């Protein structure tokens, strides 16, 4: 099985040994499987960095370094926004009122035949995308 990691899973895994035990166990169990990330999640992380920067520039810089590492580690497993994803997104959003970022992540997963790993299962179920909650 292959997974598209939602932003909340990426953020949790960033905590390392302090991350939720169930998420750490899930990540260890699925290590040999294919994990992907959407450019939409990278954009959400960037938004968080920029909102944090005026209040806590040191923390923002730390998260920015993590984001750079994340991009490098995922390499070609960072999935772009493509024409196919745009078409799928249009079909989703026409029928289901969702947050733009969630619907774009769902469209990316559907286009690539991936299961979304997320804490926010209820946000993705209306899209018809397979979901898994690694938080339990």
PLM regions with names:
Residues 1-38, 51-69, 136:
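Short, well-structured N-terminal submotif of metal-dependent ribonuclease cores
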Residues 39-40, 82, 120, 135:
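Residues at the C-termini of beta-strands that transition into short coil/loop
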Residues 10, 42-45, 86, 124:
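A generic structural signal for short hydrophobic patches within well-formed alpha-helices
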Residues 47-53, 61, 72-117:
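Active-site neighborhoods of divalent-metal-dependent phosphate/nucleic-acid chemistry enzymes
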Residues 1, 106, 110-136:
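Acidic, PIN/NYN-like endoribonuclease modules and their adjacent C-terminal/linker elements
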Residues 6, 44, 102, 120-123:
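Acidic active-site catalytic centers that drive phospho-/nucleotidyl reactions
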Residues 37-40, 104:
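Aromatic- and histidine-enriched alpha-helix N-cap/loop-to-helix transition segments
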Residues 36, 79, 132:
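General small-molecule cofactor/ligand-binding pocket signal
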């Amino acid at each position: 099985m292959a997974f598209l990691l939602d932003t909340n899973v990426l953020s949790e895994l960033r905590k390392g040994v302090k991350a939720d035990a169930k998420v750490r166990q899930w990540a260890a169990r699925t290590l040999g499987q294919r994990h992907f990330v959407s450019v939409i999640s990278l954009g959400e992380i960037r938004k968080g960095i920029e909102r944090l920067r005026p209040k806590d520039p040191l923390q923002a810089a730390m998260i920015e370094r993590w984001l750079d590492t994340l991009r490098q580690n995922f390499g070609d497993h960072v999935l772009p926004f493509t024409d196919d994803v745009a078409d799928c997104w249009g079909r989703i959003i026409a029928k289901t009122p969702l947050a733009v970022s969630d619907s774009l992540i769902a469209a990316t997963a559907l286009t690539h035949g991936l299961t979304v790993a997320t804490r926010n299962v209820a946000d993705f179920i209306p899209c018809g995308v397979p979901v898994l909650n690694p938080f339990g």
